[in-house]
Design a protein with these regions (language model features):
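Active-site metal-binding loops of divalent metal-dependent hydrolases
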Residues: 22
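Short acidic capping loops at alpha-helix termini that bridge into adjacent secondary structure
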Residues: 12-14
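C-terminal cap/loop subdomain of S1 sulfatases and analogous C-terminal strand-loop tails that border
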Residues: 76-193
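Long, internal low-complexity/basic segments
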Residues: 39, 175-192, 197-203, 207-285
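Substrate-binding rim/cap in mid-to-C-terminal beta-strand-loop elements of soluble/periplasmic
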Residues: 2-7, 28-108, 187, 205
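Short catalytic/ligand-binding loop motif for oxyanion handling, primarily in non-cytosolic enzymes
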Residues: 25-28, 34, 119-120, 140-141, ...
Length: 285
């Protein structure tokens, strides 16, 4: 592609973006909200548009910034093309800046979240999470902590695709010395999680309940909910059930949990038969 753009003489004035999907297909990563799930590779090239190259910039950016960037560079607004209001910000402020470090003051954090990734829970419900990353801290709020974060055990933890890694991790549930690996990947979680990404980039130690992080937990919770309210997120406005009521897109898999437990043969090709627990597990933490 780059060779073609160069052949046509437009490479230097073309914004080229290379990024990826969210999360590797491993337990506690794919479909989750931890740093390895949401911290994606991103490379952008635009020789004529990115001023002062060689700078090291620490601003947080998000996928939701792409659309406003493309619209601004094209000279049009979301209203002109019939789009809903955009929560992201154009990256042009970074492209045009001369600053290193924090180039744009409002980019000192990023909001993340998840709802339903796959079927496998009662009523096709998801596992709603909202989070904020700021100052190398990751704060997560789990709105339904009584639900299984990777899908129900009796339907195969369907939010995590089958793999040798998943198989070996599931085996640790019955090992007193290794059970913590199962807990981290598939066990129930509390309503709040906080991780110090400098010391714990793999998000293994939840410090939300530690006295040393009490102030940071409160500050991030307040900022997260304030911004979600400004965005009219139904989860913080008392209407979160609307996400659970959306029908699953696939007719073949809609109502998966109830149909599976009735004995119906369903094509759950993304998990292994051995992923399925023979009986529901107790809901304890």
């Amino acid at each position: 592609m780059l060779n073609l753009l160069e052949h046509r003489g437009i490479l230097s004035n073309t914004l080229v973006v290379a990024t990826s999907d969210n999360g590797m297909p491993f337990p506690r990563v794919k479909g989750q909200a931890y740093d390895d799930s949401d911290h994606m590779p991103l490379a952008m090239q635009w020789p004529e548009g990115i001023r002062n190259p060689g700078r090291i910039v620490t601003d947080y950016v998000s996928f939701i910034d792409f659309a406003p960037t493309f619209l601004e560079l094209a000279g049009i607004t979301e209203k002109q093309v019939g789009m809903a209001p955009i929560a992201g910000r154009s990256l042009n402020d970074i492209f045009r800046s001369a600053k290193s470090g924090q180039a744009c003051a409002v980019r000192d954090h990023v909001i993340i979240g998840r709802e339903r990734n796959d079927v496998g829970r009662p009523h096709d419900w998801g596992y709603p999470v909202r989070g904020i990353v700021k100052n190398d801290l990751l704060y997560l709020h789990n709105f339904e902590p009584a639900r299984w974060p990777s899908g129900n055990p009796e339907t195969g933890y369907t939010d995590c695709g089958g793999s040798p890694t998943k198989t070996e991790t599931l085996k640790t549930r019955l090992s007193p010395k290794q059970e913590h690996r199962w807990e981290l990947s598939f066990g129930l979680r509390g309503a709040e999680e906080l991780y110090d990404l400098r010391r714990d980039p793999n998000c293994l130690k939840n410090v939300a309940g530690d006295a040393a992080f009490r102030a940071e937990t409160l500050q991030l919770r307040v900022q997260l909910f304030r911004e979600l309210q400004a965005q009219a997120d139904p989860r913080v406005l008392g209407r979160g059930q609307i996400f659970d009521e959306y029908p699953f897109a696939s007719d073949e898999l809609r109502g998966f949990y109830e149909r599976y437990l009735r004995g119906e043969k369903l094509d759950a090709r993304w998990i292994n038969d051995s992923d399925v627990e023979p009986l529901p597990l107790p809901r304890t933490r």
